[in-house]
Amino acid sequence: METQCRPQVRCLDPIQGKETRVTVIVRGRAIVAVEDDSYPIPADAAVIPGENLLLAPSLADLYSYSGEPGYEDRETLSQLVKTAIAGGFGDVAILPNTDPPLDQPQTLQWLKQRLNQIEGVNAHHQPPGDPQAENRPDSAPVQCHWWGSVTQGNQGKQLTEWGELDQAGVIGFSDGGAIQDWRLLQRALEYGAIAGKPLALVPLNLSLRGNGVMREGPLAIQLGLPPDPVMSEAAVIASLLELLPHYGTPVHFMRISTARGVELIVQAKSQGLNCTASVNWHHLLLSNEAIAHGLPPHTPHYDPNLRFDPPLGNEGDRLALIEGVKSGVIDAIAVDHQAFTYEEKTQTFAETPPGAIGYELVLPCLWQGLVEKNLITPMALWRALSTNPRRCLGLPEVSNSRILFDPDQAWTLKRGTLQTSAYNSPWWNHSLKGRVVAWES
């Protein structure tokens, strides 16, 4: 196995806000040493310039969906873990929207046992004929965390036994969707203050949304798609701002998607409320213009893979979300990874289920779309993808592992280049740049 010496690698420390240059020794796809640039080069090492590489803490994901149990035809737990590792994630938090849902301790125990059976996650799977196989890590640590259901069956009608789920080891509580019963939500805030774990809420009023699938505005009218008004998000955030001062529950606002939503989060934080917020990464790169015009050269307009929940906003929303991440008002960028089958994502735009895969795409796409365009710094991006998600989850901000990222490595998103069988992404068949090439564990 070849040993490589990569001098002059950029090393990011988002905790200290420092950037240095180091020498990284890589064997296969494992980082075996990180030294300063005075480190003597091993006699058996091939010296390859490392100026373009980035060494930084592994990433952390606040929330995503697992197909297992119940939806293994979409994606198995093994595939989810492997695609997360390939994307550079050391911590992933899974929503309780499985079948059965994670509303009882027994389901969590089953998931933990199932995860322990996936020994192959540390012996990285390489699909036959995969042109990127030689650039992936052999082994890497990933820690799975689980959100416990707020309500039984995630139906928003009756609270689960929070104490039992807490003792079983959930990272926090969420239904993965919008809770509409405000009296029940008030009780959840009361229980959350006792548990002391984050309560992740989707700010969405379903009555105001109606059957909307595209953000309300001229483009929705032009395309003939049912509109979803900004107020369906903003009204819920504003109402929660009235409730939160009365409780000590750490609340996380999921999937902020509008400029008005960002303004309300600014207001919440200026009041000193115990809250954090995140944005789905697609909303930082895409606007509703993509639905109208597609993503050249391979993604057509009305592409079902461009349907998200919440829907993509206008360009003003996108820029406000980017500024929110840069300023820290939006604490974290969430992957919100959700696999679907071919049959599910080849329906009409209004009928297809919302969501897309993301673990292996989020870092290269955000690097290309934001960092290379000087819309965000590498340090700010890493805080939003690594340090801050861990803080929002109540985990230590310092990762116990680091990844080596090559932002210049070219590849094409197609069958055989991902560690998941799902391919519901608007970037399918697109040429991309950026890959995680090694892990330090």
From Swiss-Prot:
Answer yes or no on keyword ATP-binding: no
Q: What protein family is recorded?
A: Belongs to the metallo-dependent hydrolases superfamily. DHOase family. PyrC' subfamily.
Q: What is this protein called?
A: Probable dihydroorotase-like protein
Question: Sorted alphabetically, which keywords does the UniProt record give?
Answer: Pyrimidine biosynthesis
Q: What does this protein do?
A: Non-functional DHOase.
Which InterPro entries does the annotation name? Answer: DHOase, DHOase/Allantoinase_Hydrolase, Metal-dep_hydrolase_composite, Metal_Hydrolase
Gene name of the record:
pyrC'
What Gene3D superfamilies does the entry give?
A: Metal-dependent hydrolases
Q: Please give the Gene Ontology molecular function terms for this protein.
A: allantoinase activity; dihydroorotase activity; metal ion binding
Q: Which GO terms describe its cellular component?
A: cytoplasm
Q: Which domain of life is it from?
A: Bacteria
Q: Which GO terms describe its biological process?
A: purine nucleobase catabolic process; pyrimidine nucleotide biosynthetic process
Q: Where is this region: Disordered?
A: 121-140
